Swiss-Prot record:
The gene is truD. Keywords: Isomerase, tRNA processing. Belongs to the pseudouridine synthase TruD family. Pfam families: TruD (PF01142). This is tRNA pseudouridine synthase D. One of its GO terms (cellular component) is cytosol. The active site is at 79 (nucleophile). It comes from Yersinia enterocolitica serotype O:8 / biotype 1B (strain NCTC 13174 / 8081). GO terms for biological process: tRNA pseudouridine synthesis. Residues 154-302 form the TRUD domain. Disulfide bonds: none annotated. It catalyses: uridine(13) in tRNA = pseudouridine(13) in tRNA. Responsible for synthesis of pseudouridine from uracil-13 in transfer RNAs.
Amino acid sequence: MDMDNLTWLHGKPKASGVLKANPEDFVVVEDLGFEPDGEGEHLLVRIRKHGCNTQFVADYLARFAKIHPRLVSYAGLKDRHAVTEQWFCLHLPGKEAPDLSTFELEGCEVLESVRQKRKLRIGSLKGNAFTLVLRHITDNQDVEQRLQQIAAHGVPNYFGSQRFGRGGNNLVLARLWANNEIRVKERSKRSFYLSASRSAMFNLISSDRLAQQQATTVLEGDALQLSGRGSWFVAAADELALLQQRVDAGELNITAPLPGDGELGTQGAALAFEQACLADQTELLALIKRERVEGARRAILLKPQNIAWNWWDEVTLELSFWLPAGSFATSVVREIMNQDNADAADIAE
């Protein structure tokens, strides 16, 4: 998926700059959203790492603790080209915790460990706190204005390019799989390709709503989501005025679909809009139905929390904010500047 074809909320940026000139320019700290139990058969280990990806560290932890790799879990993937603080979960029923003071892996540091009753699963994460350094910015006045707009109105909640693989290859392979041109046996690859398919369709519908200047306008039959919640309800025609007020106040979010094997969830005008957007996606929709993927909804717009910024000099900006799990920091950066190093990997979830 070409991210340059997606609509901007605040218009295409005038400035360009560099994100992740070095790993220390992209710092991510996981927010579990809960306090560990302090007891139980699982051991939570918080690690600061750079230069190694999540699965590599998980496998190394398994060898260190002398347990099967399947007994080490985590809440989400983090890129190796960044400094990240991430929780890992070791299942140790009836076993003593390993001596983590002797844990040595280049680029990794154990920060703490604590017992937990429940397994840490993919997605069981409240969010991530980001601290970024943007360098070589060409128009700091435009960037400053955009930061003010983002703080007030947010950004499109697009899935970042990482979701689609290098060069969009996950989406290419998903289409080949949909047309029975390739067979996909590995469970992880099937998951990647299905995720890329659904994410691409979400981005497409969200971009079209933005292009029609309807990303904040409630349509009859829209699926509306309480801010910070996953549940949603359908907008009735006789309640549009009241619901619009609640959207304007930030209480409700307008959503777009992550299509599944059931209905999209919208009705009336909103359903017609989404069906029109997906008219050319029949092969991916058929694949998702064939694989019996459960549908979901996701807010079209995202407002970064605790956003703050500091200009180190005229061309260098430090930016910090918090995003809910599954949202992409580079979707925020995309509204600020054009990346000179657009191949820089994304980090989320």
